[in-house]
UniProtKB/Swiss-Prot annotation:
The lineage of its organism: Bacteria, Pseudomonadati, Pseudomonadota, Gammaproteobacteria, Enterobacterales. One of its GO terms (biological process) is DNA replication. It holds the Pfam family DNA_ligase_aden. It comes from Salmonella enteritidis PT4 (strain P125109). The active site is at K125 (n6-amp-lysine intermediate). InterPro entries: DNA_ligase_AS, DNA_ligase_B, DNA_ligase_CS, DNAligase_adenylation, DNAligase_N, NA-bd_OB-fold, NAD_dep_DNA_ligaseB, NAD_DNA_ligase_OB. This is DNA ligase B.
């Protein structure tokens, strides 16, 4: 299918000084779009933390939050007000602040971060809800939600009902502050195959709702920080395990370089785990004293997250493709995103009707994933731009019997027919892709789909963009095509039959084909009444008849008298 480029509308993009890709919006629109997205994130955030209900997938929320920060930086706006943290409803102070964790983009960033740091350990980045546990005189006295890192909600009554969280401790842990992740316990969770399951939202929902004590049995705890704990990591892990926090010991590995981090990351991505993860955290054994911990200032640890299964991508343009059958397909061009090491910059929306139902316009944010064989797939529209500037699709008068001859309105279907006849399903013209057909047609102005047979070697060689070797190859391919079987030439003319049906028919000439009745076609494999009728319509089409006579004049096998 070819792109109807003249009908495509899009938005322009420009690079900011920071290197981010920025929408080329007028100041007023930029301010409006930022405000709208900021408000939407705040609304989702409020519902999430007050009601324990996720109105949007965790990954989508995170990606749109990052998109908002990007837009704010593009226009030089302060990003401190971005609503990516919980609303401050709790007033219980953390005895030790939650620092958060810096995100590293790739292995190169991991190598750079590890350089100059020693005694490093890696842990899975468990996906759940962060909490502070305070033990005094051997008893759990307080449990505080992360909140803004300095203060949060008092979750003590709920946490006391979670069987997996020790209520008493001994030794060095009798008076200790622990930070960790409350997670949804899973049996044999394979992250690569099962994904995130919105685990964070499910945990938050359980902790927010009332009268759900039985549901809390499914929650677990992974301790990832013991402020002012033993400086020796093995000793720290051993004491945590003895106190009942065994997962920390099991899933904390010493690492010396980025290769070891990468191996652990890949192993946890593909192995069965008791929790959902979204990456790994690398941390130094040596940490500053707890009184120096501040939100956003934990430079002794960093995260390397897994790439999301689906990416939020910005639609940059809407384009229309017209295939050889005349079907109009809508394609969304995207600001490129990376999915499973694949650069995705367009996604097929399918028909005009489906596009209209999706209501997608340039500037919208859509969720894209990879379907079978790595084909990009549209999953949902996660954010719509205020401006709804949509292109007008081409007229829908195209069908399987149009555009065998070139015309101004037939350009795209005509090119699609050329690409088809050059494919292995028809004449098998090696090296003839869409770009080559466009170049030949633009230079030599084909009258119909077989006009290329009349080209001389000199004409092909003089086509702009064709090197000597390429033009000679094309000339050889065109000459070889003359020797192809009658069946392949009929396939090139887009007869509405499969090659197997044509072979079963046994026709070896145009004259034989003209003598066949509709009843004959119905009896062929995978050919019923409807398709047989289409064959008759195709055979009687004036353009097809004219092309058959032209091929006869070119002495193509099966078309002569």
């Amino acid at each position: 299918m070819r792109l109807w480029k003249s009908m495509a509308w899009g938005i322009l993009l420009w690079h900011s000084q920071s290197g981010a890709l920025c929408p080329a919006w007028p100041p007023a629109r930029a301010a409006e779009e930022i405000t709208r997205l900021q408000q939407q994130l705040a609304d989702w955030n409020d519902i999430y933390w007050k009601q324990g209900v996720s109105a949007v997938d965790d990954s989508v929320y995170d990606q749109l939050s990052a998109r908002l920060v990007q837009w704010q930086r593009c226009v030089g706006q302060d990003v401190s007000s971005t609503p990516v943290s919980p609303p401050l409803n709790g007033t219980t102070m953390h005895p030790v602040a939650h620092t958060g964790v810096r995100k590293l983009a790739d292995r190169q960033a991991v190598e750079q971060w590890m350089r100059g740091r020693s005694e490093l350990w890696v842990q899975p980045k468990v996906d759940g809800v962060a909490v502070t546990l305070v033990y005094q005189n051997g008893k759990l006295t307080r449990a505080i939600s992360r909140g803004n890192g300095l203060q949060g909600e008092d979750w003590t009554p709920k946490i006391r009902l979670i069987p997996s969280i020790p209520q008493t401790t001994q030794g060095a842990l009798a008076n200790a502050v622990l930070q960790g992740e409350i997670f949804l316990q899973r049996e044999g969770h394979i992250q690569q195959r099962m994904g995130g399951m919105n685990a964070r939202s499910k945990v938050a929902g359980m902790l927010m709702r009332q009268d759900n004590a039985s549901a809390l049995n499914s929650l677990g705890i992974f301790i990832w920080a013991w402020p002012d704990g033993p400086a020796n990591m093995p000793e720290r892990l051993s004491q945590l395990a003895k106190a009942g926090f065994s997962l920390t010991n099991k899933y904390t590995l010493a690492v010396k370089d980025a290769s070891e981090v990468e191996r652990a990351r890949q192993s946890w991505l593909t192995s069965a785990l008791p929790f959902v993860t979204d990456g790994v955290v690398i941390r130094m054994a040596k940490e500053p004293a707890s009184q120096h911990w501040r939100p956003g200032q934990g430079d002794w640890l960093a995260a390397w997250k897994y790439p999301p299964v689906a990416q939020v991508a910005q639609v940059s343009a809407i384009q229309f493709s017209v295939g050889k059958s005349g079907k109009i397909t809508v394609v969304a061009s995207l600001v490129p995103v990376i999915l499973d090491d694949k650069r995705v910059q367009r996604v097929n929306i399918d028909s005009v009707k489906r596009w209209e139902a999706w209501d997608i316009a340039p500037g919208d944010q859509i969720l894209v994933s990879l379907a079978g064989q790595g084909i990009p797939r549209l999953d949902e529209v996660v954010w719509r731009s205020r401006e709804r500037s949509k292109p007008v699709p081409p007229d829908s008068h195209f069908n399987s019997l149009t555009c065998f001859y070139a015309s101004e309105t037939c350009q795209e279907q005509f090119i699609s027919r050329l690409v088809w006849l050059g494919s292995r399903s028809a004449l098998g013209l090696d090296g003839m892709g869409e770009a080559s057909w466009r170049a030949l047609h633009q230079t030599h102005r084909f009258k119909h789909i077989f006009s290329w047979l009349a080209l001389t070697s000199a004409q092909i060689a003089n086509t702009p963009g064709f090197a000597k070797g390429k033009s000679e190859q094309i000339w050889r391919q065109f000459n070889l095509a003359r020797r192809q079987s009658f069946t392949r030439w009929i396939m090139a003319m887009d007869i509405p039959l499969t090659q197997a049906a044509l072979q079963a028919s046994g026709d070896r000439s145009w004259e034989q084909l003209l003598m066949r009745t509709e009843q004959h076609w119905r009896q062929l494999p995978a050919t019923g009444e409807r398709r047989a009728g289409r064959v008759i319509d195709w055979r009687n089409n004036p353009q097809i008849k004219t092309l058959s006579r032209w091929l006869a004049a070119q002495h193509i096998p099966g078309f002569g008298s």
